[in-house]
Amino acid sequence: MRRLAAIGLCIAAVAAPATAARAAPQPGLGLLQHGTLVRSDTEASTNWAGYAVVHKKPFASVTGRWVQPSATCSDSSPTYSAFWVGLGGFARRSFAVEQTGTLANCEGGSAYYTAWYELYPAPPVMLNLPIRPGDTVSATVSVKKQTVVIRLKNVTTGKLFTKKLHMKRPDLGSAEWVAEAPSGCDFTGNCTTLPLTNFGTVDFTHSTATIKGHKGRISDPVWTATTIELHGDLAGSDQPSQAGANAIPGAVGADGGSFAVTWQQLAPPTG
């Protein structure tokens, strides 16, 4: 796998999130960011785990489902994780990402679960869509010219959020299904990948993307799929990392659109 690039969900810690539903506490660094892939000098990433697909034609939509994982909060140290589908953000020089998903964060020993969307580089929006561990979540991001439609549904409760938005320069160069270690950014734009929540395993299903005239799953031979592994101890990445754990995706299932990402504790240093 080639080196991977970086943007993300940016949550301002100093402002109350719009229409927040049990919003997860935010880090004191100033911004909690999700989005483009942080690249490293290895085959892995310091912030993304999952799959991305690319094609010479622009993508029009991406869809996926996952079961909201339960956060294990072992002590008072804050940890963060995000699960989402999106368009853009994968290319090395990506300038934007359109994404929606859920968070599983720990703060003060307690777990918090939140739904959100983001059209990076605009800040993210927290949603009044209650999410609990074990809930099945369905997400779709679709783009036509400068119109972005976000659709996020808690399939378990039947609650649905949908919104049509304007975005001047959407990135349609890739489609992704990702578990992420968010980044904390100060107000000068310096960012660090934050400690990754122990989420156990998150199962993605119904993963599809569309380009003009074609809809397919991750393993569709029409496009090129890349497996992305998150390694919290990589050297030579584009930004510092405090992820402190790995997140490793399994193989895509026989249906072509399902896979699992598993949190892994870092092995102790040797020597």
Placement of each model-derived feature along the sequence:
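Exposed, interaction-prone regions of secreted/extracellular proteins
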Residues: 24-271
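Long, low-complexity, intrinsically disordered polar/charged segments
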Residues: 1-3, 112-113
